[in-house]
């Protein structure tokens, strides 16, 4: 799937907004173009390649996916600061969901995606951001909880 937009709720917490802006910033560095950040209420129902970021309690699209059991319920399946990264087809449209049990988990999920899928290197003296032609994401189904809180 190719990422085309990032969707976060107007009622998102500061950490959820930080997660969305962080992903947007790195996407700009990868491809040299802006990926739009769209309110979950303004995201068109026919938006293919949307990244849905946030908690089920703040993002109605993620809540609907949890209720329809298209993605796991983070409150039941994760420890604090844990995250779920899931690609899926919903109504014929590709979506990438990054959610967590709490806002810190959403941010952890974004950083996991950046490191493990997009190859960003975070080092004491800086970071390494690979250049890409497009933002293609493979099929993913990741659920992770840290062994210790406050990663």
Residues of each region from the PLM?
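Short, well-ordered secondary-structure micro-motifs within conserved domains or adaptor modules
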Residues: 37-73
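A sequence-composition feature that detects small, non-aromatic residues
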Residues: 12, 19-20, 33, 47-50, ...
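Feature activates predominantly on carbohydrate-active enzymes
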Residues: 2-3, 11-22, 26-28, 74-151
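Long, low-hydrophobicity ectodomains and other hydrophilic envelope-associated domains
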Residues: 22-26, 30, 34-37, 61
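Surface-exposed patches in mature extracellular/periplasmic domains of secreted proteins
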Residues: 33-41, 125-126
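Compositionally biased regions
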Residues: 6, 10, 40-41
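Structural motif
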Residues: 8-12, 52-58, 99-101
């Amino acid at each position: 799937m190719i990422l085309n937009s990032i969707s976060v709720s107007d009622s998102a917490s500061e950490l959820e907004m930080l997660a969305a802006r962080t992903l947007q910033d790195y996407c700009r560095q990868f491809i040299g173009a802006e990926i739009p950040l769209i309110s979950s209420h303004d995201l068109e129902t026919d938006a293919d390649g949307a990244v849905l970021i946030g908690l089920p309690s703040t993002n109605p699209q993620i809540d609907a996916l949890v209720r329809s059991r298209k993605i796991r319920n983070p409150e039941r399946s994760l420890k604090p600061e844990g995250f779920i990264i899931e690609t899926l087809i919903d109504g014929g449209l590709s979506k990438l969901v990054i959610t967590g049990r709490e806002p810190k988990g959403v941010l952890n999920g974004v950083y996991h995606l950046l490191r493990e899928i997009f190859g960003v290197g975070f080092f004491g003296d800086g970071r390494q951001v690979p250049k890409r032609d497009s933002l293609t994401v493979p099929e993913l189904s990741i659920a992770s909880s840290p062994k210790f809180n406050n990663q």
